Amino acid sequence: MLYIIGLGLYDENDISIKGLRAIEDCDEVYAEFYTAMLQGSSLSAIERRIGRSVKVLGRGEIEEERIPIERALELDVALLVAGDPLVATTHTELLIDAHRRGIETRVIHSSSIISAAPGLAGLQAYKFGRIITIPFTSDNYFPTSPYTNIGENLKAGSHSLVLLDIEAHRNRYMTATEGLRYLLKASEKLDDGTISGETLAVVIARAGSEKPLVRADKIATLVEEDFGDPLHCLVVPAGLHFIEADYLVEIAGAPRAVVERMIL
């Protein structure tokens, strides 16, 4: 049996009771933190919470050597992952491989930024369009597709959840400020008027913690601010319902003049 168990958003206390009980039944417990890492926790804290030792696997050990699959041929194995298990394609591929090899599987879900961010931003979840990721750029690599995809969402009247690149193995996490700078640079490069310094955006930091940060304003203001420790993400809203607008003012600190022009 292969269990893929979500650890949730922020720390070791986010794992579900169902997940803890499944771990009790497992012969071996593995984890991967290259797709994401719990920023409010550590391996030792996770081990204390679940009462088991955990072997952390690298990308090659999972995607090439298929260690969880090989071990699950004979044993009950748990693979712990940050967030919700099936958001990452890597974990979906493991389930496909396990099914083809006759291994029984069970997925135990947990909280994810995909569902948490719309709620924290006070925006109606069904109004979100395609999820966007801004990658780390360089002098030789500057894709504009994240920017244009946000534009497509805006044209459709859909909010955009914008995830920011991480390189967990390097302890490198894109900040909201870096993401906003990307949007302004892409806007300057394409010169299409989709996004500007006057565009409303929402910054979310440390979702799942006791005190997550939610801050809304025009990009020109936000890009000058410091949002503290990771993880960060962005939301670029389309047209707003009046309740969404009130939330951004009252909870996220947006100037009313900035959001009122967005009310449908």
From Swiss-Prot:
Pathway: Protein modification; peptidyl-diphthamide biosynthesis. One of its GO terms (biological process) is protein histidyl modification to diphthamide. It comes from the Archaea. Pfam families: TP_methylase. It is an enzyme of class 2 (transferase). S-adenosyl-L-methionine binds at residues 9, 84, 87, 112-113, 164, 207, 232. GO terms for molecular function: diphthine synthase activity. Its EC number is 2.1.1.98. It catalyses: 2-[(3S)-amino-3-carboxypropyl]-L-histidyl-[translation elongation factor 2] + 3 S-adenosyl-L-methionine = diphthine-[translation elongation factor 2] + 3 S-adenosyl-L-homocysteine + 3 H(+). Homodimer. S-adenosyl-L-methionine-dependent methyltransferase that catalyzes the trimethylation of the amino group of the modified target histidine residue in translation elongation factor 2 (EF-2), to form an intermediate called diphthine. The three successive methylation reactions represent the second step of diphthamide biosynthesis. This is Diphthine synthase. It comes from Methanothermobacter thermautotrophicus (strain ATCC 29096 / DSM 1053 / JCM 10044 / NBRC 100330 / Delta H) (Methanobacterium thermoautotrophicum).
